Amino acid sequence: MTQQKLYISDVTLRDGSHAIRHQYTVEQVKQIARALDDAKVDSIEVAHGDGLQGGSFNYGFGAHTDLEWIEAAASVVKHAKIATLLLPGIGTVHDLKAVYEAGVRVVRVATHCTEADISRQHIEYARHLGMEAVGFLMMSHMTTPQHLAQQAKLMESYGATVCYVVDSGGALSMNDVRDRFRAFKDVLKPETQTGMHAHHNLSLGVANSIVAVENGCDRVDASLAGMGAGAGNAPLEVFIAAAERMGWNHGTDLYKLMDAADDLVRPLQDRPVRVDRETLALGYAGVYSSFLRHSEMAASKYGLKTVDILVELGRRRMVGGQEDMIIDVALDLLKQQEHERIRSEPVSSEAN
């Protein structure tokens, strides 16, 4: 494993968009893409945080369109492939054709971990266009390793040449990661690659990525300064430093990544991307990481604690795409608080 070239997939310009509410400027995209390309990452994923056509009232509107961001990145990249993310039902095959013409050569088709069957049309069309099609199984902690592997097998049968364990909630332990990659290797074709997309909500983003590689993972997602939803993704520069110390062949320039993380990306964070009370609650409760900023807004609006909203979302097993339910949960918590207040009030009695 130490001699095999790891495929380094950067997600700063897609998952990282969540951290700043999808407000990257075109110039920022160019600067970051140029720095990543100069550091020789293998692919650079570009899109709204929720994938192609993710800009909406539900998810939040971006400062620019997906095509504007993609064209900006493609205009400065010489080495890396431009990648993007598509959620079936949000992005369409028409969007795939448009981004292919704009320079995208890798598409990650993302579904909930038990819904791989909805990816067929988009994976098949991506292959028809000549794109590399990647199966991306989100919230992978919410099903068993064996069932997850069967879902990956479905994506493989549709034409995916890579299948990912996606820890959207940052809730997987190192043993959980190991078990999922072993299950993948048991059922997927030898030529089908596997990938790891970690989140750092339990501070395990880098550790889980290392365990994944130790169990046969071919591709690792990471972002500069951990820029991503929740407590962020595995910080790219940290993972590369660890990989370097372990003697792994990653092919990137560590110092250029360190400079880009601190000089270009960290200054953009209006809310620090870190493990804190709220982002820890995401990992603890197993909640979709991009729910963070939406839950913070709801908590502020209704005078609630963000942690209480996140824990309740986890209890209800909400998944990506159910952002509209965050307000429902907040209102339910308000009602519950009001009922508890009424019950706790002393009952007044009139004197005879």
UniProtKB/Swiss-Prot annotation:
On whether Glycoprotein is a keyword of this UniProt record, the answer is no
Top EC category: lyase
Keywords in alphabetical order, please: Aromatic hydrocarbons catabolism, Lyase, Manganese, Metal-binding
Q: Which domain of life is it from?
A: Bacteria
Q: Give the reactions, separated by semicolons, that this protein catalyses.
A: (S)-4-hydroxy-2-oxopentanoate = acetaldehyde + pyruvate
Q: Does the keyword Metal-binding apply?
A: yes
Q: Where is this site: Transition state stabilizer?
A: 14
Taken from the UniProt record, the cysteine pairs bridged by disulfide bonds within this chain are none
Q: Give the positions the UniProt entry annotates as the active site.
A: 18
Q: Which pathway does it serve?
A: Xenobiotic degradation; toluene degradation
In this chain, Mn(2+) is annotated as bound at 15, 197, 199
An annotated GO BP: L-leucine biosynthetic process
Q: In the Enzyme Commission scheme, what number(s) does this protein have?
A: 4.1.3.39
Q: Where does substrate bind?
A: 14-15, 168, 197, 288
One GO MF term: 2-isopropylmalate synthase activity
Q: Which family does it belong to?
A: Belongs to the 4-hydroxy-2-oxovalerate aldolase family.
Q: Identify the PANTHER family for this entry.
A: 2-ISOPROPYLMALATE SYNTHASE 1, CHLOROPLASTIC-RELATED, HOMOCITRATE SYNTHASE-RELATED
The protein, known as = 4-hydroxy-2-oxovalerate aldolase 1
Recorded source organism is Pseudomonas putida (strain ATCC 700007 / DSM 6899 / JCM 31910 / BCRC 17059 / LMG 24140 / F1)
Biological classification of the source: Bacteria, Pseudomonadati, Pseudomonadota, Gammaproteobacteria, Pseudomonadales
Gene symbol?
todH
